[in-house]
């Protein structure tokens, strides 16, 4: 959430940022609403101040035996008591309206973010590795998995409907191996602390990271009002909600390997075959909590940590700087890692790493104190996939496919595969 004080002082900057995202100007509307709220706050404060002053004056009048003045003041206090509830309700209503309006406004992109409309305007930051060179024809992951006999979409549909997958045998083990490899890498070498956290959260947590209220249709909601997490970003970031941290203990770096749940409400007709776009999928999430001065450098570090996963798996990928029209709601800058999928003859997103500044922290009221600071400051938050496990499995299947239809296990995963070096067709 943006700072209304900043908006009051920089209305043109807000509208310019919204224009970069393809949104209509809102500064004038927000400032007008804030002026009404501030006027209501002042009215309430004036009434309270006058009530307190009049109450003291009653005592003084009675001490002076001025009964007429005392009765007049009592009548004034009684009138204020009748007026005050309506004034307080108006203040609460206008404050809630302002918070709701602010909560629907996206973050302000950094100046170095390319301006564009959609994914076609994203910029290549770097390319790592090369496309595999084969004599055989590439195949898509679902063709490979079904031919091997370990990827079952029919039974998944019988159990749960569309956009679910059942993996069995060595493919189930490969999925588990990928997740374990990612967690081990990030905790042992990258300095992240592993967290096991709930998969269901309160609305306040989803609001804190920015999915509510604007993107509720993308979420799964339980009958008691909780939400299934769309990503462990929600739980990991909200660990510091409503806390004041010591600056010297920052940054905090958290990681978790969890299922993620998404309705894919806006994805009708997209990636309907296979397991590229699922309602439920495993993902290794990275979250950093920093001070205001360190977040940009931390963003580069986090992205490098995610890239290392793909490098060690020997996968060809590119890192993209997302344009203003393609970046997420809460982000100030985002790098997407896109892995090469030979079966699709295309790069596809496998990780997204974003720096959010204090946007989420304001929603969560998460702050830190410095040694010499009189006032607490909002933390900066970052999140990234390190990486999506299912999409990584897809990449391994398509890039390590052999001519006979078997799939070679990448060397870095061998310690997790119980002696298996190749996945071959089920007998």
From Swiss-Prot:
Signal sequence range: none
GO molecular function: ATP binding; serine-tRNA ligase activity
Stored InterPro entries: aa-tRNA-synt_IIb, aa-tRNA-synth_II, aa-tRNA-synth_II/BPL/LPL, Ser-tRNA-ligase_type_1, Ser-tRNA-synth_1_N, SerRS_1_N_sf, SerRS_core, tRNA-bd_arm
Top-rank taxon, per record: Bacteria
GO cellular component: cytoplasm
Protein's cellular compartments: Cytoplasm
Sites where the protein binds L-serine: 231-233, 285, 385
Keyword tags: Aminoacyl-tRNA synthetase, ATP-binding, Cytoplasm, Ligase, Nucleotide-binding, Protein biosynthesis
GO BP terms in the entry: selenocysteine biosynthetic process; seryl-tRNA aminoacylation
Reactions this protein catalyses: tRNA(Ser) + L-serine + ATP = L-seryl-tRNA(Ser) + AMP + diphosphate + H(+); tRNA(Sec) + L-serine + ATP = L-seryl-tRNA(Sec) + AMP + diphosphate + H(+)
Gene3D superfamilies, per the entry: Bira Bifunctional Protein, Domain 2, Serine-tRNA synthetase, tRNA binding domain
Residues binding ATP: 262-264, 349-352
Record NCBIfam families: serS
Function: Catalyzes the attachment of serine to tRNA(Ser). Is also able to aminoacylate tRNA(Sec) with serine, to form the misacylated tRNA L-seryl-tRNA(Sec), which will be further converted into selenocysteinyl-tRNA(Sec).
Family stated for the protein in its record: Belongs to the class-II aminoacyl-tRNA synthetase family. Type-1 seryl-tRNA synthetase subfamily.
Comment, domains: Consists of two distinct domains, a catalytic core and a N-terminal extension that is involved in tRNA binding.
Name of the protein in question: Serine--tRNA ligase
Organism of provenance: Rhizobium etli (strain ATCC 51251 / DSM 11541 / JCM 21823 / NBRC 15573 / CFN 42)
């Amino acid at each position: 959430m943006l700072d209304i004080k900043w908006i009051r002082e920089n209305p043109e900057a807000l509208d310019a940022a919204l224009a970069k995202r393809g949104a209509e100007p809102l500064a004038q509307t927000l400032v007008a609403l804030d002026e009404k709220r501030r006027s209501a706050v002042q009215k309430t404060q004036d009434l309270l101040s006058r009530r307190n002053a009049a109450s003291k004056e009653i005592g003084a009048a009675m001490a002076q035996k001025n009964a007429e003045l005392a009765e007049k003041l009592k009548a004034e206090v009684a009138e204020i008591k009748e007026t005050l509830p309506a004034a307080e309700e108006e203040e609460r209503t206008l404050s809630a309206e302002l918070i709701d309006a602010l909560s629907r406004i996206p973050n302000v992109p950094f100046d170095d973010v390319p301006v564009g409309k959609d994914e076609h305007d994203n910029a290549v930051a770097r390319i790592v590795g090369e496309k595999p060179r084969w004599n055989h024809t590439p195949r898509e992951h679902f063709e490979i998995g079904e031919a091997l006999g370990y990827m079952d979409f029919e039974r998944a549909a019988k159990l749960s409907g569309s956009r679910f997958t059942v993996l069995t045998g060595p493919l189930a083990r490969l999925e588990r191996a990928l997740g374990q490899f990612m967690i081990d890498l990030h905790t042992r070498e990258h300095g992240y602390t592993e967290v096991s956290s709930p998969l269901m959260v309160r609305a306040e947590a989803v609001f804190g990271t920015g999915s509510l209220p604007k993107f509720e249709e993308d979420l799964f909601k339980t009958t008691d009002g909780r939400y299934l997490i769309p990503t462990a970003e929600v739980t990991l970031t909200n660990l510091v909600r409503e806390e004041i941290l010591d600056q010297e203990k920052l940054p905090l770096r958290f990681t978790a390997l969890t299922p993620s749940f998404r309705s894919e409400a806006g994805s009708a007709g997209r990636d309907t075959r296979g397991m590229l776009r699922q309602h439920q999928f495993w993902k290794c999430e990275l979250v950093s909590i920093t001070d205001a001065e360190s977040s940009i450098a931390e963003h580069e570090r986090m992205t490098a940590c995610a890239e290392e996963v793909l490098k060690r798996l020997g996968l060809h990928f590119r890192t993209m700087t997302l344009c203003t029209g393609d970046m997420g709601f809460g982000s100030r800058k985002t790098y997407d890692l896109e892995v090469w999928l030979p079966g699709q003859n295309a790069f596809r997103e496998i990780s997204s790493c974003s720096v959010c500044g204090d946007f989420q922290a304001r929603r969560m009221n998460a702050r830190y104190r410095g040694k010499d600071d009189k006032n607490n400051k909002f933390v900066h938050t970052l999140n990234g996939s390190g990486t999506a496990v299912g999409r990584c499995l897809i990449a391994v299947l398509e890039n390590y496919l052999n001519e006979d239809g078997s799939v070679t296990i990448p060397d870095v995963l061998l310690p997790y595969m119980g002696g298996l070096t190749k996945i071959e067709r089920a007998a």
